[in-house]
Amino acid sequence: MLIGILSKKYVKEILELLNEKGELHFSQIHKEIPTHMSSLNRTLNELVKLGLISKRKEDNKQALPKTYYKLTPLGKKALLLYEVEKIIENSKNNQNIIIQIINGKNHNIINAKIVNIHNK
């Protein structure tokens, strides 16, 4: 589930890193993300499985080829959810928020009205 993975530790940092730097190999990501290699590997594999990042292995004759990761278009859209979260957290308690998300593929505008449920 997308929301579940986005709330996991270091996922936001990984997505933002790949968005900023482009394609990186595992050790480059590990250098920036302060976690155990096994935890990072597990998280990256989950992100690949959900289609938020893509994975490719370097095509060469090395015994251990480098694995590269890159943010996908879906991953870029997922980063928008962190922005929505920030807007909601920064809003006043009694304020209604209208969020417009533009779908770049077919330019549909999706309006979502988020009402503060505490006032109801």
Swiss-Prot record:
| Cysteines engaged in disulfide bonds, as pairs | none
Q: Which residues form a coiled coil?
A: none
The cross-references to Pfam families, in alphabetical order and at most eight, read: PadR
What's this protein's family per the entry? To M.jannaschii MJ0361.
**UniProt-recorded name of the protein:** Uncharacterized protein MJ0944
Record organism: Methanocaldococcus jannaschii (strain ATCC 43067 / DSM 2661 / JAL-1 / JCM 10045 / NBRC 100440) (Methanococcus jannaschii)
Its taxonomic path starts at:
Archaea, Methanobacteriati, Methanobacteriota, Methanomada group, Methanococci
